Amino acid sequence: MSRWKAAIVGSGNIGTDLMYKLLRSEHVDPVYMVGIDPASEGLARAAQEGLDASAEGVDWLLSRRELPDVVFEATSAKVHAAAAPRYAAAGITAIDLTPASVGPYVVPAVNLHEHLDAPNLNMVSCAGQATIPILAAINRVADASYGEIVAAIASHSAGPGTRQNLSEFSEKTGRALAQVAGADRAKAISVINPAEPPMNMRDTVYAKVRNPDADAIERAVLDMVAEVQRYVPGYTLRLIDVDGDLVTVMLEVVGAGDFLPTYAGNLDIITAAAVQVADVLAQRTLVEEPAR
């Protein structure tokens, strides 16, 4: 069976973890990895796995005789903002793991079906991928007037980009909690925990609701957790409590350990979600092609 050909732009931790996940994909074949550092471990690993790897950037990628069907952007918002129009002009679908937000916010378990034809899809943030599904589930059955999330990640899993852009990621996640999950108002708080040994990603979702039906809320949350677990097996519900109109849900995310340590569930969930998006898009396209 034919598969979508993929390029990974960015050879750091995120890009390298993406590669290992894509190597297991039934529908997406990682063909290229692009970076800017010839000494990058990610590029070396990509070459070992048989990918065509280059430190010559996006110019090199777009000069290939055979272009990819999809590109995973694992660089920076500035880099993606500049490259996105070029991908679109070349007919390449872009899955954006940066804060650039060129395309719509996408969370596979919640709203991917609304954006199947989008040329550019933004993966929100690590915290967003973990918490938006839960708030969306609560909102669907209980009408959330307010949502607030607290995402705690291990210090070792927070690179320079995360640290420098923590406020930006939190603001973006808050916007997505309202836009995608549907809460009237929302706020996101991110915490970097220096504990040793490093802790797994932990998330708490609070929601104030208008229709506090505890049984319906619990069923909705359990169903959503099961849906996310289809592509993030280490996504676990730790607590759900409905106290009047206040709902509290606690989660833990353990990474798959493909490249990153298992405590880096915050990074694992966004790469797993990005691969899930590509798998769904590729499967849909490959099914439709024979009928054309």
Swiss-Prot record:
GO terms for MF: acetaldehyde dehydrogenase (acetylating) activity; NAD binding
Active site positions: 126 (acyl-thioester intermediate)
Binding site for NAD(+): 11-14, 157-165, 266
Catalytic activity, as annotated: acetaldehyde + NAD(+) + CoA = acetyl-CoA + NADH + H(+)
Enzyme class per UniProt: oxidoreductase
Domain of life of the organism encoding this protein: Bacteria
One family name in Pfam for this protein: AcetDehyd-dimer
Single GO BP term: catabolic process
Keyword field: Aromatic hydrocarbons catabolism, NAD, Oxidoreductase
SMART domains per the UniProt record, alphabetical: Semialdhyde_dh
UniProt EC number: 1.2.1.10
N-terminal signal peptide: none
HAMAP family per record: Ac_ald_DH_ac
Family indicated by similarity: Belongs to the acetaldehyde dehydrogenase family.
Name of the protein described by the UniProt record: Acetaldehyde dehydrogenase 2
Lineage of the organism: Bacteria, Bacillati, Actinomycetota, Actinomycetes, Mycobacteriales
